[in-house]
Amino acid sequence: DILSGLVGSEMCIRDRVCTFPGWEAFRDESTVYTGSWTVGGPGGIKSPFTGKKTIRLVDLMHHRGGLVPDPQYPNATVAGELYLQNLDDISNRTDVIDRICRTPLMYAPHTERAYSDVDYMILGLIVEQVVGKRLDEYLQEGVYRRLGLERTGFRPLDIRTPPDLIAATELNGNTRDGNVGFGTRPDGSPVFIRTQTIRGQVQDEKAFYTMSGVSGHAGLFSTADDLGVLLQLMSNEGMYQGREYFPADVQRRFLTPDGDSATYGLGWRTNGYYYFHGGPSKAAFGHTGWTGTITMVDPIRDIQIVLLTNMRHSPVVEPPNEFAAGAFPLAHYVGLISRVYSALAEDGRVTDVDAPLPERAASSPTSSHRFRVVPRRRSSR
């Protein structure tokens, strides 16, 4: 199985980025300090850190590579020489690899844990190189189609998903209600930026403008039903309806906390009592999304939670990143998870006692991923 082979090798995830074909320039000598990313500039780079050639895939998965969190490649003012917009040619990955190789470090590698979109941009690009296919095609053929997922994928408008079935995100494109622009071209014309309500396109700027909508860090569209299947697959350690999609030990490796943090696995946030406190077992894991989403799996209690909101589809109240919907109760993910567990506990459906992980089931019922609201038991008082 390609998926198992891709993620199942300890040697693979410990390979250095610069050892992959096309990434030879991922070294300090290629770094440029430009735009907001000059040393001492507004981007926050305090020193010309070195050590790019030591960065491994596992460092990126743990967000310990030290790369600039958001280089803003499509913004000419911020990115400077790193500027890149590539809206239409998904097959052209050479230019974005070039920009990433020249992107400076914010911290010395392996010294700080800082979330960086670039980490998973790199991982997605390397997956494409390893499997010899675009990321969207590989996942569609190797995972989503096999699982029967009909509403999961990148660039949904390309597969004729009706726009009215897709939640809108920002009201005025990526302008933050007119507070943000992408600068000007050498001829004085403005750099392109979306100004209309975003619907059916990825909101993330780097994913849309630089990666043509297909990236390892953003751009995936789905539904609660489809995500329920994927979470059931994770809850069942790689098995779904009698088929193994990846070995259980691969998943356990991804959920093993990093040495100096109990809350970071490989791509997942782990340790339910810390990250999803207020009910989930210690085995719970999940992730949040900036646009207003969260997924959580509690394998001990066999609970999966999917929350898909379009929180950013609201006016900007404190430019450039605060939105009015941020004050809504649903915007506070951790509190919401706690409330779900409190309701289940009141109904007698969960307890506070952690139990061993259940035996890995050979299959899952086809209805296991369907979601419905369960009325709370009425009190006799």
Task: Please annotate each region the language model reported.
Residues 1-15:
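Single conserved hydrophobic/aromatic residue that forms the stacking wall/gate
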Residues 295, 302-310, 315-319:
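Short, well-ordered beta-strand elements
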Residues 267, 294-296:
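Short, surface-exposed charged micro-motifs
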Residues 17-284:
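Short, surface-exposed loop or secondary-structure junction motifs
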Residues 127, 234, 299, 308-311:
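Short beta-strand segments enriched in hydrophobic/aromatic residues
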Residues 236, 250, 259-260, 273, ...:
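Short, gly/Ser/Thr-rich active-site loops of penicillin-recognizing serine hydrolases
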Residues 289-291:
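Short, small/polar residue-rich loop motifs at catalytic or cofactor-binding pockets
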Residues 218, 293-294:
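Beta-propeller and closely related beta-sheet repeat lectin domains
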